[in-house]
Amino acid sequence: MISTKRKIAVGILLAFALVFSACKKEGKTKVIRLGHALDVTHPVHKAMKFMADRVEEKSNGELRIDIYPSQQLGSERELLELLQIGSLGMTKVSTGTLENFAPELKVFGLPFLFRDRQHRFDVLESEIGENLLESSVRNRLKGLTFYDAG
């Protein structure tokens, strides 16, 4: 069963590629930069803020996620390219942008692909979903999870 927090918001949270090469160290604290294109009022941004707060709390301050919303670091495509070169640690992008790096993700553009919401989550939590998350690894990107787009 998928937790409610994993079902939040839009698109795919992607690309934990090169996390530690995109970290900077401030004293004992490692910092991961997370960029995205959404406004700070968007539910996904709020979920990312929640995640960042929990990461810092659970790591006793040894790991911090700095969030750069509203395309501060670039468009979705530019964010993916920053991941590839190690200048960014994490991003959240839509499958429409990501399918340029992993054509397998074009499957999400098919109408009526899933019977209902539960079927969608059952598929995405299966080996099929894992394979889709891994499909961008050849381009130095690593998918973490799927998010609900509505």
Question: Which ranges hold each PLM region?
Answer:
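Short, low-complexity disordered leader/linker segments with a strong preference
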Residues: 1-31
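Immediate post-signal peptide segment of exported/extracytoplasmic ligand-binding proteins
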Residues: 23-36, 56-64, 137
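Extracytoplasmic "Venus flytrap"
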Residues: 33-49, 70-74
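Short, polar/charged alpha-helical segment
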Residues: 41-66, 126
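Stable alpha-helical elements in mature extracytoplasmic
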Residues: 44-51, 75-79, 120, 128, ...
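Contiguous mixed-secondary-structure segments that line small-molecule binding/active-site clefts
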Residues: 53, 84, 94-150
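Alpha-to-beta junction loops
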Residues: 61-63, 79-93
